[in-house]
Amino acid sequence: SMGADGKGNIGRSGMLDQADIVIGSFSKTFASNGGFVSVKDTYAAEYLRYYSAPHTFTNALSPVQAAGVLAALEIVRSEEGRARRERLMDNVLYLRNEMTKAGLEVLGEPSPIVPVRLGSEAVGRLVARQLPRFGGLANLVEYPAVPRGDSRFRFQVMADHTHEDIDAVVKALAAAMRAGTQEALSIERDGDNNAHGRAGH
């Protein structure tokens, strides 16, 4: 989904023909399952065929999944695909900018997946519980997928999102952050009060 021709960062850097092994997923741009491995020579292909655990324990794509991938690839290579990538990157940059303006910590480089740092697992879970109340939806990622104490949301941006959609989710996240943080402080205070009460007996 990245770059003018949709060939990703490796295509943008002009390295596609120089890479010995290229691996890609069908779960994002292609909205399917599985992925691919492309190699330069038959020796690498044979090695991966026999010694790559992901290949050994996988199955072939179904015909329906393969047809979906091919249909998506046709769009990627078309003028429609180019226009959608431009809209997508515009939305990515707009979301990152609006999140930052709202005082939220955005991680990583611009891509269709926008991570927003929450901090502790406790706060992350409370904010995740609050977010749908305010009209937002995001994937919570926490330890062990990320370092302990560094939980985050992963927002997935689409070309079809409008700036109004993005404004709404930024507003929802800011409200959920306030509510979740207040709830975490309240739980912490209650715990301290209970501890003091037990100590007094």
Protein language model annotation of sequence segments:
Residues 63-110, 114-137:
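Conserved PLP-dependent catalytic core of the aminotransferase class-I/II
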Residues 14-47:
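Active-site PLP attachment segment
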Residues 42, 62, 143-145:
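Short, ordered loop/turn segments at secondary-structure junctions
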Residues 38, 115-117, 156-158:
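Short hydrophobic/aromatic beta-strand micro-patches
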Residues 1-7, 34-37, 151:
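Short acidic, glycine/serine/threonine-rich loops at helix termini
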Residues 133-134, 145-201:
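PLP-dependent enzyme catalytic core of the Aspartate aminotransferase-like
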Residues 52-61, 79:
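A short glycine-threonine-serine/GTX helix/turn-capping micro-motif
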Residues 1-21:
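Active-site pre-lysine segment of PLP-dependent enzymes
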